[in-house]
Structures are given as structure tokens and as C-alpha cells.
Amino acid sequence: MRTPNILLASQSPRRRELLALLAIPFTAVRVDTPEQFECAASLEENVRRIAEEKAREARRLYPEESSSSIILSADTVVEHDGLILQKPQGEEEALAMLQSLQGRTHSVHTGYALLYGERKHTAMATTRVTFNAMPKREIMRYIATGSPFDKAGAYGIQDPVMASYVSGIEGCYYNVVGLPLSAVWAAIQKMVV
């Protein structure tokens, strides 16, 4: 069976690049939904809920496009020492996040949601990443690029400066970039059967 068009509810250029790797037709649309964590819910419940809220908002905002498409959305966070690191709000927060990750292992969690007609699938993928120690001058140089400010945990593993300090990865690399491709592709295949 032919895979329907994907309606990607994301402003992330990285998610668009990743989805393009699957060589399936997709359209990216903008949705603005709050990415607020509920204290009473688990991390997994939160990222799955946020992803589903984005997908439902895309369905509401783009009814014509979504009527025959699979809607895909995601939410990525970094977890380190029991803290949730989302997108930093400024240089100081980016510096604190990046310094806390140096020489240590953290987890990257991506909740994703797929809506297709009445069908729904939500899940979460987790990848563990270990960084070598990074000198403060390198961290400041990276922050000066502006790259940390639209990324959970204040870094992009694919960014050349950061990639040179990754000493280990356990799980899906693409999950750290923003979308666990193999898990998403498997879920899409199940939806269209």
C-alpha cells in the first residue's frame, strides 16, 4: 500500500531534514502549542501528551491537508540528574545546561504522535548520550553561534563543535537530532495496513 502524505506538525528544520531521509511525501506546517510539563505526570506521559496536542492542533488548523494525511508531531527533552532540560531561554541558561552535561551521560527523550483518520499512535524513544569534558571557551564559542537556543538541552549532536565531544551514544542517533526515524517509520507502516 502507498504511504499517504505526512503532515509534519513541526517548525524544526532538523525534523524536516530527518523526514526527508525517508523519501516519502510530506508537508511541514507550523503549530504553536505550549510545551508545558504537568508536575503530576511522568516524563513519558508529558512528552507523549505534548506531541499529541501538537498533532491535534495541526488537524484543527489544517483540516483540508490533514483529512488524507498522517499527522506527525514530536517533542524532545533532555533529562539529566533528574532535571528536564528543554530549550534554553538565554545565554546563561545555555551555559549552565551545557556545563552540567560535560563528562557525563544524559538521556534524550522524544515523544511522538501519529494521527491518521481515527487511528492514533503515541510513543517515546530514549537515547543515552555521553559527552567528554568541553572547555568553557568552546562552550561559549558554541553559544555564540546561536545554535543552542532552539534545541532541548542546548545542543545539537549534529553540530560540528558538539559532535567532536560526544564519546558515546546508546540508542537511536536520529532520536537525539529530533525524531527516532526507525520507530516512526515502523509506526507509519502499521497505520497504513
Curated annotation (Swiss-Prot):
Localization, UniProt: Cytoplasm
Disulfide bonds: none
Active site (catalytic residues): D75 (proton acceptor)
Source organism of this protein record: Chlorobium luteolum (strain DSM 273 / BCRC 81028 / 2530) (Pelodictyon luteolum)
EC code(s) of this entry: 3.6.1.9
An example Gene Ontology CC term for this record: cytoplasm
Protein's UniProt name: dTTP/UTP pyrophosphatase
Any one Pfam family match given in the protein's UniProt record, by short name: Maf
Cofactor: a divalent metal cation
UniProt function note: Nucleoside triphosphate pyrophosphatase that hydrolyzes dTTP and UTP. May have a dual role in cell division arrest and in preventing the incorporation of modified nucleotides into cellular nucleic acids.
An annotated Gene Ontology molecular function: dTTP diphosphatase activity
UniProt family annotation: Belongs to the Maf family. YhdE subfamily.
Biological processes, Gene Ontology terms: nucleotide metabolic process
Chief location bin: cytoplasm
Reaction equations catalysed: dTTP + H2O = dTMP + diphosphate + H(+); UTP + H2O = UMP + diphosphate + H(+)
